[in-house]
Structure formats: structure tokens, C-alpha cells
Amino acid sequence: MSFFIRSLPRLPKTYNRSVFLQSINKRAFHQSIANMGVHNIANATEFKSALADNQVVVLDAFATWCGPCKAIAPRVVKLSEDYPAAHFIKIDVDELPEVSQQLGIRAMPTFIIFKGNEKVAEVVGANPVALENAIKQAVEGVEPKA
């Protein structure tokens, strides 16, 4: 922890450094993980189950080394909060090559929207406007899951 404290940037004298450090220590990271709106899929069975159990599914096919994937990730989390009628999942294409091959994913990020187990839209690339428009169309008339 002392290395972390020393590596903090110098804060303006008007800001209380100890208050800042206390706020970092109080952050409950485990709680934010549990409340995430985008769920990691670990295997093909989980993927099939997510499609079967939800009326609208938004799939984010990403790679850990992909810069645009990292850039759009916070926006995808925000969209998951804005559209509760859709179930948001993500797969790492390097971890699940059979699923990504089955879906025909050729570039990252690729977003595929399923409605009633059928693919209804695909957005290739980090295009938040196109993604939101596709989600809006898919969730139209769908009630949020309780």
C-alpha cells in the first residue's frame, strides 16, 4: 500500500489527501462486480442458456488485447442499465473460439443482438450510436425481466 500512496499524483493543497485515501479504501469493488449489467460467458453451455432464458440478448464479442473493445466497454455497461429488457452478455473470442466461430465473428468488437433465439442485428466495430439504435429496435414492445 505504501508504494501505491507514494505513486499517487500530488494533489492540490486545497484537497485533503487523507480524505482521498480513505475514499479509495472504502470502495467496495466486490459489490460493483455483483451488480454489473454485462455478464461474462465462460462456456458454450452458458451461452446457449443465456439465449434460451432471455427474450432479448445483446452479445459483446471482445478480445482482451482489443483497444476499441476496451474503449466501448463502459458505454456497453451504461446501455445495460438503460435497457433492462435486454440481457447483456460478453464472450472473449480467444477463450471461446468455438462460439465465436459458430457466430462468424471476424472483427472485434462485434455486437450481435438476438430476439427469441434468432439473430436480429449485428454491429461490427465500436459504434455506440449504431449499437444503441439496434438495441432500441430489438427491445421495442419487450417488458423488462423482473
What spans do the regions from the language model cover?
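N-terminal leader/targeting and pre-domain segments
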Residues: 2-57, 137-146
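Acidic phosphotransfer microenvironment of two-component signaling modules
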Residues: 45-48, 97, 129
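Non-catalytic, surface beta->alpha helical segment in thiol-disulfide oxidoreductase systems
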Residues: 107, 112-146
